[in-house]
């Protein structure tokens, strides 16, 4: 577990995490509303697409796709999904073919996903601090 004391620390931590990602990784981001899931995803996307990339939250349209030179990044927000099957209407099977997948609010579809999965758990502490833990295949994914 890592305590992130500011937005800057969270940003740097997300960038470091992104350096360890590759095509075919599925990253599940968990945490309460306002925990920083979208912020964390933005830094991952910027790592691959460039810091000036216009990144839009997928909250309303459920999916944003970003192109990198070698693969696409599929950024899903499952907050408004009512049925796990709805993810297939959003091109999920296509996303599985050599792309990086980021899923916020993944609880509703987690049981449909094939391991290995990388889980990023964010929790708000006092004074805007965050507690972050990262797990892969039931083992702590520790790169620091």
Swiss-Prot record:
Binding site for ATP: 34-39
Keyword tRNA processing in annotation: yes
Protein residues bound to Mg(2+): 38, 104
Cell location: Cytoplasm
A Pfam family the protein falls into: TsaE
Gene Ontology terms: cellular component: cytoplasm
Superkingdom assignment: Bacteria
Keywords: ATP-binding, Cytoplasm, Magnesium, Metal-binding, Nucleotide-binding, tRNA processing
Position of the signal peptide: none
Gene Ontology biological process terms, A to Z: tRNA threonylcarbamoyladenosine modification
SUPFAM superfamilies per record: P-loop containing nucleoside triphosphate hydrolases
Principal cellular location given in the protein's record: cytoplasm
Keyword tRNA processing: yes
PANTHER family: TRNA THREONYLCARBAMOYLADENOSINE BIOSYNTHESIS PROTEIN TSAE (PTHR33540:SF2)
Family: Belongs to the TsaE family.
Record protein name field: tRNA threonylcarbamoyladenosine biosynthesis protein TsaE
Native source species: Rickettsia prowazekii (strain Madrid E)
């Amino acid at each position: 577990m890592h305590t992130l004391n500011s937005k800057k620390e969270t940003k740097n931590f997300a960038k470091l995490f992104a350096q360890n990602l590759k095509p075919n990784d599925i990253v599940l981001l968990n945490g309460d509303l306002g925990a920083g899931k979208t912020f964390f995803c933005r830094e991952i996307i910027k790592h691959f697409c460039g810091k000036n990339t216009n990144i839009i939250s997928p909250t309303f349209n459920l999916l944003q796709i970003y192109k990198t030179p070698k693969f696409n990044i599929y950024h899903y927000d499952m907050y408004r999904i009512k049925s796990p099957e709805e993810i297939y209407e959003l091109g999920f099977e296509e996303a599985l073919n050599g792309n990086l997948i980021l899923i916020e609010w993944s609880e509703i579809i987690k049981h449909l996903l094939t391991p290995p999965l990388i889980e990023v758990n964010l929790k708000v502490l006092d004074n805007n601090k965050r507690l972050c833990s990262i797990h892969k295949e039931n083992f702590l994914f520790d790169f620091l």
